[in-house]
UniProtKB/Swiss-Prot annotation:
Its main location: mitochondrion. The lineage of its organism: Eukaryota, Fungi, Dikarya, Ascomycota, Saccharomycotina. GO terms for cellular component: mitochondrion. Residues 1-32 form a transit peptide. It is found in: Mitochondrion. Belongs to the AIM23 family. It comes from Saccharomyces cerevisiae (strain Lalvin EC1118 / Prise de mousse) (Baker's yeast). It comes from the Eukaryota. It holds the Pfam family mIF3. This is Altered inheritance of mitochondria protein 23, mitochondrial. Keywords: Mitochondrion, Transit peptide.
Length: 356
């Protein structure tokens, strides 16, 4: 039997332990602690989500949506301001030309700009009373081949709401008004682009408007005001060679915003007679008309009268010794005809003189 000294055995064990002196095993490796690294990252992500949730709650989010990121939370879309003004209103017209439909749609669009609900006031053709309505119902059944729409007045309710007074007019009147609207719109666009000069615009208005003056006169005007203020205004214009058109109507109508449109149909023969006024009112209007004739008799030719004293009237005045302008077509034709006859007569006389 081999005998080994005890000292040698102890020295060998000490040498073995010295070679592993830097290894310290504090925990045995097993299946339970195999995912310890994964748990560390999982806890860190959980903590990050908790902090994010607290931040979401501090910003006033709902508690049930606090666990979701902001980009996944569905929020209702906010309605933009003035969305009703930008909403396209569509009314289907079954009659009329394309131009007539465009004119009607232009009026409808203007109505909704002034009142987003489409509320209007209309004149009842049977009772002749102003009654409330809505353009969606009022437009039904309108035959655009015969008639059209026109805004004759606008009533201001408050700072935001207005109620237009809508009237049914002849198709030609509606188309004429729409053409004027497009012309003004195009002129404005050209001026903004710099294509049309302001001086040119002023020149055109000078030719068309400056020579023709409009004066409003109420049937209820006092006699002193008519003989002094109005008489001075009318006579001054006639002396300068301006043509003057006088508009006579009731005080409430003559002071409306679109008072001129009430006189558009007086240039043609009216169907039917307006209701008869009380004798005192009729005599008052007759006195106003007679006073106007006396005022202008010295400075103007015989006035052209349109309308009826029971309703409204137009008095067209041309100053004396002034040739009619182009818009007086009949008078211009007569003048040219007379000039041609005079020239022809002179030629005949010259021919006779040469033959002799």
């Amino acid at each position: 039997m081999l005998k080994v000294p005890l000292s040698d055995v102890l020295s060998q064990k000490m040498l073995f332990l010295k070679s592993f002196r830097y290894f310290h095993c504090t925990k045995y490796f097993s299946r339970d602690n195999a995912s310890s690294t994964t748990d560390i990252f999982r806890n860190a992500m959980k903590r990050k989500r908790e902090l994010a949730n607290l931040k979401e709650q501090s910003h006033g989010n709902v508690a049930r949506n606090a666990a979701f990121p902001k980009e996944y939370i569905k929020r209702p879309k906010q309605v933009p301001r003035n969305a009703t003004n930008r909403k396209k209103i569509l009314i289907t017209w079954s009659t009329g030309t394309d131009r007539a439909k465009e004119a009607a749609n232009s009026v409808v669009s203007e109505i909704f700009k002034k009142n987003h609900k489409g509320n209007i006031k209309v004149v009842d053709p049977t009772t002749h009373r102003i009654e409330p309505s809505n353009i969606r119902y009022f437009a039904k059944g309108i035959d655009l081949d015969k008639v059209g729409l026109s805004i004759v007045n606008v009533e201001q309710i408050d700072n935001e709401n207005q109620i237009p007074l809508v009237k049914i007019v002849e198709s030609r009147v509606a188309l004429k008004k729409y053409s004027d609207f497009l012309a003004k719109k195009k002129e404005k666009e050209l001026m903004e682009l710099g294509v049309l000069n302001k001086s040119y615009k002023n020149l055109v208005t000078d030719k068309k408007e400056d020579n023709l003056k409009h004066i409003k006169i109420s049937w209820q005007i006092e006699s002193d005001d008519l003989k002094r203020q109005k008489a001075h205004e009318i006579v001054s214009l006639l002396k300068k060679g301006n043509k003057v058109t006088l508009y006579l109507d009731d005080k409430n109508n003559i002071n409306s915003n679109n008072w001129l449109e009430n006189f558009e149909e007086l240039d043609r023969s009216q169907k039917g007679e307006p209701p008869r006024l009380p004798e005192s009112v009729f005599q008052k209007r007759a006195a106003v008309l007679e006073t106007l004739k006396e005022i202008v008799s010295e400075y103007a030719n015989d006035p052209v009268l349109l309308g009826n004293m029971n309703s409204k009237m137009i008095m067209k005045l041309i100053p004396k010794d002034v040739k009619p302008q182009n818009n007086d077509k009949r008078a211009l034709k007569e003048l040219r005809k007379k000039e041609r006859q005079e020239k022809l007569q002179k030629r005949i006389q010259r021919k006779k003189m040469n033959e002799m």
